[in-house]
């Protein structure tokens, strides 16, 4: 009875890449208010493992749930969906 575990995949924006092989990804979702029925933005920040340090600030990335890399890092970079364009 080997059941395949379903992996969670999230899409978000890189908000920090200051640490070596680690990125912080902001995941935004919309939830409906139970009383007022208005959609509200909610966000979660997760830390993900970036083995090759290829992410930059503002990149749209896809992360997948993985084994714990450290105390707060439980996600791994799956792919860079869209590179950001920053103009100084």
From Swiss-Prot:
An example of a GO molecular function for this protein is: structural constituent of ribosome
Q: Which UniProt keywords apply?
A: Ribonucleoprotein, Ribosomal protein, RNA-binding, rRNA-binding
From what superkingdom does this record's organism come? Bacteria
Q: Which SUPFAM superfamilies match?
A: Nucleic acid-binding proteins (SSF50249)
Please name the Gene3D superfamilies in this protein's record.
Nucleic acid-binding proteins (2.40.50.140)
- What does UniProt give as GO cellular component? cytosolic small ribosomal subunit
* Entry keyword Ligase: no
Which biological process annotations from GO are given for this protein?
translation
Q: How does it assemble?
A: Part of the 30S ribosomal subunit.
Give the UniProt family note. Belongs to the universal ribosomal protein uS17 family.
- What PANTHER family does the record point to? 40S RIBOSOMAL PROTEIN S11 FAMILY MEMBER, SMALL RIBOSOMAL SUBUNIT PROTEIN US17M
Functional note: One of the primary rRNA binding proteins, it binds specifically to the 5'-end of 16S ribosomal RNA.
In its UniProt entry, what is this protein called?
Small ribosomal subunit protein uS17
């Amino acid at each position: 009875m080997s059941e395949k575990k379903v992996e969670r995949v999230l899409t978000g924006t890189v908000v920090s890449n200051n640490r070596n092989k680690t990125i912080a990804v902001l995941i935004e979702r919309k939830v409906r208010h139970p009383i007022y029925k208005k959609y509200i933005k909610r966000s979660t920040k997760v830390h993900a493992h970036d083995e090759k340090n290829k992410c930059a600030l503002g990149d749209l990335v896809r992360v997948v749930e993985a084994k714990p890399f450290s105390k707060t890092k439980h996600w791994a970079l799956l792919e860079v969906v869209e590179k950001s364009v920053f103009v100084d």
